[in-house]
Amino acid sequence: MRVSQILNPTLREVPAEAEVVSHQLLVRAGLIRKSAAGIYTYLPLGLRVLRKIEQIVREEMDAKGGQEVLLPIIQPAELWRESGRWDLYGQELMRLNDRHNREFCLGPTHEEIITDLIRGEIRSYKQLPLLLYQIQNKYRDERRPRFGLMRGREFIMKDLYSFDRDEAGLAESYKKMYDAYTRIFTRCGLSFRPVEADAGAIGGTGGTHEFMVLAESGEAAVVYCPDCDYAANVEKAECKPAPMAVDAPIGAYRSVDTPGTKTIEQVAEFLKVSKSDLVKSLLYQGDDKLILVLVRGDREINEIKVNNALGPFINLQLAGPEAVLEKLGCEPGYVGPIGAPKNLTVVADLEVPLMAKAVCGANAEDKHYVDAVPEKDFRIDQILDLRMVNAGEPCPQCGSPLKEARGIEVGQVFKLGTKYSKALNAVFLDENGAEHPCVMGCYGIGVSRTMAAAIEQNNDKDGIIWPIPIAPYHVIVVPVNMKDDQVRETGEALYQELLKLGVEAVLDDRDERPGVKFKDADLVGYPLRVTVGSKTLANGEVELRDRKTGEVQLVKVEELAGRIQGMIREALNIG
């Protein structure tokens, strides 16, 4: 391809609305253009990157026995009502009505549709296991679309669904996909880490892993152990509690005045105690239940753990100041567990019962209790892991200090079990004619998100640094002066030779200054750049520059194409 023929409108200025590097560079490099908030058009070079990622995904899915299908984007509401997710999914579900006023949604995910297909087609255990996948546009009505392709309202995903006879079969399918994902992201040239994760709105109780591309700009925090294989999203990470030492004899708890102290920090400062000596008490409302959640004062409540632990209360929300005043008679900053009403369920984090004594709110303005002993001076109805984990805490598997990193989620694998097959009656008959629900797994990759994550991990001040396997083209040939016959003709000859060897090459045939060509090449991120100039040609050589390392080599013209072919084949792991 010739640069003069490519629709590649590069920009020198950073777009005002682009907050993260990937969004900035996708727009500046002429790979995407915004059509509406969270909705983008892929321009030719951007689409080439996307298709390369898709091809890697297809090859690895096919290698594991996956069969590609194409499911509808528009899904009938009755299927979502059958699964119970029509109301559960909330405002992020894009809903619409046809001319007959029938309700539909634009699919953010396809569990209902695929399960409906299977219940109509699968009859016998002989038809299992089955792995079906698609690469499809998805839709989510984000309240605030941001970060370009990282959080859009329209995005491209690969989702594969596995159907097995039993849990053992599901475990085998899960391992296949886990291994396939490891190969996919390795082939894409990305640094990543699989971590334990929360199942979110898709649900299921069998476990799940996220695949995180490591990048400082990542919106998710992960913790990992350098001494064993433990790694988890902070939303899921297990906490290993440790008892606190007692520094003085404990008497009966007593009330003290704490005027104007509404935060943990203010109370600790006023009483001259550590934040870890306090109990943080937060009131939640869920359906018709009131729940008081307790954690140590120096910890943060993990609301995902709270919601998962108290699963039946799907509408669990933090109570506002008016609700706290009505139920407990005080402002939120003075809430505490002592004397909690009987209709209040008190749920404590694992560390709270290990506190020898504690400071807690007295459910009265400007009052706190000191020297309160958990489970002696106030009741605890349930003890659960409810807090966020922090770097430096002991690993729950081996006890070594955990480390923290930032990551971008690009894939997730779920063990769904029978959540959807039972709800939608997707069953099969075993050898004895007995009926069983299919045991399901779900495995998603954010294809468009992977493209953005690759840029977040591979960029510098000059632009994108594409890994060779997913670069729009592998090499750009740049004749520095198109008016010089020798320079122009040598550039053309090298370009044609590279094409004959199967190298994906572009020729910058524009009548532009060398600096403009070099800036565009670096901005777009071609892995290799061949510079053809009269000075080096005088010695029968051209420059070969590696975009990632910046290394420049002088290579004989007659050796160049073979050298580049070898480099590309090595990067693509072609023997």
UniProtKB/Swiss-Prot annotation:
SUPFAM superfamilies: Class II aaRS ABD-related, Class II aaRS and biotin synthetases, YbaK/ProRS associated domain
GO molecular function: aminoacyl-tRNA deacylase activity; ATP binding; catalytic activity, acting on a protein; proline-tRNA ligase activity; transferase activity
Cited Pfam families: HGTP_anticodon, tRNA-synt_2b, tRNA_edit
Biological processes, Gene Ontology terms: prolyl-tRNA aminoacylation
Principal EC category: ligase
Subunit structure: Homodimer.
CDD domains reported in the protein's UniProt record: ProRS-INS, ProRS_anticodon_short, ProRS_core_prok
Keywords: Aminoacyl-tRNA synthetase, ATP-binding, Cytoplasm, Ligase, Nucleotide-binding, Protein biosynthesis
Protein name, UniProt field: Proline--tRNA ligase
Annotated PANTHER family: MITOCHONDRIAL RIBOSOME PROTEIN L39/PROLYL-TRNA LIGASE FAMILY MEMBER (PTHR42753), PROLINE--TRNA LIGASE (PTHR42753:SF2)
Domain of life of the organism encoding this protein: Bacteria
Organism whose genome encodes this protein: Desulfitobacterium hafniense (strain Y51)
Function: Catalyzes the attachment of proline to tRNA(Pro) in a two-step reaction: proline is first activated by ATP to form Pro-AMP and then transferred to the acceptor end of tRNA(Pro). As ProRS can inadvertently accommodate and process non-cognate amino acids such as alanine and cysteine, to avoid such errors it has two additional distinct editing activities against alanine. One activity is designated as 'pretransfer' editing and involves the tRNA(Pro)-independent hydrolysis of activated Ala-AMP.
Family: Belongs to the class-II aminoacyl-tRNA synthetase family. ProS type 1 subfamily.
Compartments in which it is found: Cytoplasm
Reactions catalysed according to its record: tRNA(Pro) + L-proline + ATP = L-prolyl-tRNA(Pro) + AMP + diphosphate
Gene Ontology CC terms, in alphabetical order: cytosol
EC number(s) given by UniProt: 6.1.1.15
UniProt comment concerning the protein's domains: Consists of three domains: the N-terminal catalytic domain, the editing domain and the C-terminal anticodon-binding domain.
InterPro entries linked: aa-tRNA-synt_IIb, aa-tRNA-synth_II, aa-tRNA-synth_II/BPL/LPL, Anticodon-bd, Anticodon-bd_dom_sf, Pro-tRNA-ligase_IIa, Pro-tRNA-synth_IIa_bac-type, Pro-tRNA-Synthase_IIa_type1
